[in-house]
Amino acid sequence: MNHKIKSYILLMRLNSPIGSMLLLYPCLWGLISASSSFEEIRQNIFLFIIFILGAFIMRSAGCVINDIFDRNIDIQVDRTKSRPLADKSISLYESIAIFITLSSIGLCILLSLNTLSIKVGLLSFILLIIYPLTKRITYWPQLFLALTFNIGVLIGYAAITNILPFEIYFLYAVGIFWTLGYDTIYAYQDIDDDISIG
């Protein structure tokens, strides 16, 4: 495989789809919660396809912007020093171009939804950009990741109902605690490097 193509795949984490699945699950929770029957799910199958595509595209965009912000830190961490931006197999300008391309595709997908979903989706994009920066100002970046990764619950629910009742925020909260759990475990593997970097 061409080395550059392999670097693009690694940058977008296409070799590791589990992150996309973790982003997709909350979207599916929202879509299913908003559906009153299997028949309604079948009728809205196009929305499910849209959310599957959106989850994979925006997870990749999130990984790219994360690596852009963390490129100088990733060099110092054993687990991340071989990432394409850290080892300079991809330039910063290439990475920015990939991020803009992925974000543009994500926006096109988002614009196929209703107005409320678009508004929440734009909020999620802001969170996606803010998350990497929170690692510099708080000991709880997992909370911001959880807010970002689970907002699909709200987008999915709104995509079908065009409303966001108070009750759906309980499901959002469940997702937040779920992500806090698994991401804290994931982050723990870097604890020695985090301490040495400060």
Question: Regions from the language model: what does each represent?
Answer:
Residues 24, 28, 64, 109, ...:
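Hydrophobic membrane-targeting signal helices
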Residues 1-11:
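Short, Lys/Arg-rich, polar N-terminal cytosolic tail immediately upstream
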Residues 32-50, 118-124, 128, 143-195:
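Functional transmembrane core segments of multi-pass inner-membrane proteins
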Residues 14-33, 146-150:
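The first (N-terminal) embedded transmembrane alpha-helix
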Residues 9-10, 83-170:
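Intramembrane alpha-helical segments
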Residues 54-107, 176-198:
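Solvent-exposed interhelical
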